[in-house]
A protein has these predicted regions:
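Detector for Asparagine
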Residues: 10, 15, 97-98, 104, ...
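Short, surface-exposed, charged/polar-biased interaction segments
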Residues: 39, 79, 94, 131, ...
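Glycine- and charge-enriched low-complexity intrinsically disordered segments
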Residues: 107-153
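Short, positionally conserved secondary-structure boundary motifs
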Residues: 1-72, 151-186
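Feature for secretory/organellar precursors and membrane-associated catalytic proteins
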Residues: 28-34, 44-123
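Short, intrinsically disordered/low-complexity patches at protein termini
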Residues: 101, 144-146, 157
């Protein structure tokens, strides 16, 4: 895993640099160049604490399961992981890599198999067969970012509880109307 280039705000805090989809193709090479990183949008989110953070725009549906998870266009913020050995099974990571078989930036749920073959197993939350599990060789992984938060434009769909409450409310309104009609003054 390589050292990352960061930018800082006026008070000396690390900015969160955003890598939008349009910039992801050049990120693998550009990430080591200060000018490239400074050309990307940067922002700050209160409450993240200390550390180096980077944001990436999500593309595709591989991490979308049952209408929950990560939607295309979501922004995921990850904290820099200095040692690849620190990848923990079952957590979501953003992996910057130079493997030929997959995108250079992938958002996946990972399994650490470094001691059993020198690979990180990358799993999609979407169970559709078009999003298969795949291994990433350790030598192909250039940056690791542990998922911390997401910014999304999607509002969660109502749960079954809301549907039941809405049905009860509708029934009450209908009963109220029927009761009004049955009273002698109406």
């Amino acid at each position: 895993v390589r050292t990352v280039v960061t930018t800082v705000d006026n008070s000396g805090k690390d900015n969160i640099v955003l890598v939008p989809i349009k910039a992801q193709a050049g990120y693998l090479v550009g990430a080591q160049q200060e000018e490239y990183i400074e050309s990307l949008p940067a922002f700050w989110i209160p409450g993240l604490g200390h550390g180096s953070f980077r944001a990436f725009e999500v593309s595709g549906y591989s991490m979308l399961a049952d209408r929950t998870g990560f939607f295309p266009g979501d922004i995921v913020v990850g904290e820099y992981v200095e040692k690849i050995e620190d990848i923990r099974d079952g957590f979501v990571y953003i992996l910057v890599n130079n493997a030929q078989e997959v995108d250079n930036i992938v958002l996946k749920r990972c399994l650490n198999y470094l001691d059993k073959g020198g690979v990180i197993i990358c799993k999609s939350d979407n169970k559709d067969p078009q999003y298969p599990t795949f291994p990433l060789q350790v030598e192909n992984i250039k940056e690791v970012w542990k998922f911390k938060i997401k910014l999304t434009r999607q509002s969660p769909e109502p749960s079954g509880l809301y549907e039941r409450i809405n049905a009860l409310e509708r029934d009450m309104v209908l009963m109220k109307e029927q009761l009004k009609k049955s009273l002698p003054n109406n």
